Amino acid sequence: MLRYILTINLLSDMCCGSGVGNGSSQDIISSYDNYGLPIIYGRRLKGLLRDNAEFMANFGYIEKTLVDRVFGTVSSPGIIRVGNAQIADAEEIKSELSDISKDISLNKIINSGNIEEVFTVTRTATAINDEGVADDQQLRSFGVVPKGVKFYSEIEIDVNTDNCAEYRLLEDVCKSLRGIGLNRNRGLGRVECFLQATKVKAYENAEIEIGSTEIEYIIETKDSVVSTGDYISGSSLQGYFINQLLSKKLIGENEVQDCLSKVIFSNAYICKKGKKYLPMTLGMFNIKNDKDSFYSIIDGYKMDDGKQYVKAKGYYCILDDRIYTADIKNKTEFHFSKKTKDLYKISAIDGGQTFTGRIYSDNTEFLKKILKVINNNKGIIHLGGSVNAQYAQSSITIIKQDDTPKDNDNNKNNKDNYNNKNDGIKAKDGRLIVEFLSDTVFMNSIGVNAVDEESIKYNLCKILGEEFSIEEIYTETVKVGGYNSKWKAPKRRYLALKKGTQILVKIDNLQEIKEQGFIGFLNSEGYGEYKVRDLLECNEFDWEEDGQDAVKGARIDKAKDIISKVCKNLAERICQIRVVNNFDNETNLSASTVMRLIPAFKAADMDEKKGFMDAFISYVSKNYKGENNKGIRDYSNKIIEEFNKIDSRIANKYVKAEFNNNKNEMFRTFLQAYITQAKLYYKEKR
């Protein structure tokens, strides 16, 4: 696998259309990410590169089979992966923008909308009829990314050397890419592209301890990961690693079934700020319209008949009798197929989130081979669908013992190791709680998929023994299945107990119990993970937001220029609003006075020696002398006086600093707004 960076330099404005407008000033806008930074999605880039390759094939420069081998077909994914193209240092900028929540003053003004304005200029166009005259009601505006911006996309190609036809094709199609986005045959979207080898980042190979039966990891999604759920499923991890083991010849076809049966891939759930979250238990409730308190019914909380309760949702972590909750950021993307003319949507887990899970096996050799895959790929993995463009790229980090995220309080006594038999269970009054951490598929005594109480008890006997009774069950049922990418067909669907299911049992004779492990069917894909615990002494929990108090001084380095431009734009907007608000009182303003401001404005704009404000004052004093010009002098002084009042009206310290650091530009905006407003005033008056 070779990795390269495709650099895209905009030689003209570009509208890499998202298919929507902003609803007010622009009919079509370019594509931006969640932070407001411009982006060229990988699917678009890959399509453009393929168009160039097919153009070369149609004229006989290359074979069509080479194009299909590199870019893929309907039945074959190809050997190339094209990542999203972003501006330089995009990841560091996003990290700093996330930290802005710690600074109260910045947090109020830095948002995706204001950042988009930094990277957007407005262009307009209209339709011309056969007589060469503009049609009525046909004016359209476009939000475009200005020329000069550079984008960088990571491209991976599954070859061992650059001295091959596949790499030469990639290099040629990148060099021949000349236009991107809307109206690229009418001046927009002219680009210059070149390919260069990526710098190899330092990577510390992960190792497994002798005799260890598990690997614990953290996955950080770099791109969005195609998924219909809000977690990374064990089946997607299983599919990725099995394919990698086969392609790298670490296992043979005859070892696949052995690997599938002996390696368990758990689901990976959200992990934030050192806290490991689990699916919300189905016995946890809130009072309706009150999300600040949580009540665990199965742990003994008695519902008040005068209150209405609803099931809690999301993911949770309990620490020190406080409950923390986490929501997963999901997104829906719409795409258009050029060949079939179909509009379709893709559901995905948003990038920039972390998930943690484990891989278990009694066969250490399989775990070593999985680690070898991770190390060979420098910790980069691709999960979910559409792995060849735009989606799927993530990083995986193996957790050492000292780096393990905090477990929930109701699990803190567990060593939390697969196959470990712990002695932490007390079973007060002989009662225990079994919780399912993932969807669980059960077969009854005759091998038929079932979720009735008898089937549940039949399967629980394998971990609790024969002498127990079920007292309470909090559960829901779901249908689980999947898709077999090798056979291009859906898998069989099963009825399962939903993750978060809780079962209260009473054991007559407590014996050694395996407190955590897997039960039921399809364990290798993450189904059936469970834990056994005692009833909690506390069954009411206060909710605490998983965040940090806002503090001053957020870390800003790479995002400094962007934040400065946002503050400058806001300062200019304040100047313009100030003009509009003041102009209602300009009832005695003559048209000649306004028109005489225009040459003063132009002269100040062309003066390269003096600042704009000084040049304007100098021009007025030199050219508008005498009693006849008193009106224009007084009006100019009034404009300057009103401008000087703006400083005291700006509340935000960052915007005020930008206003004072760019007073000449601010005054130019202020004066231009006065002239524009005056023209509109006299146009309406006529």
What are these regions (language model features)?
Residues 1-686:
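Conserved active-site/ligand-binding neighborhood in enzyme cores
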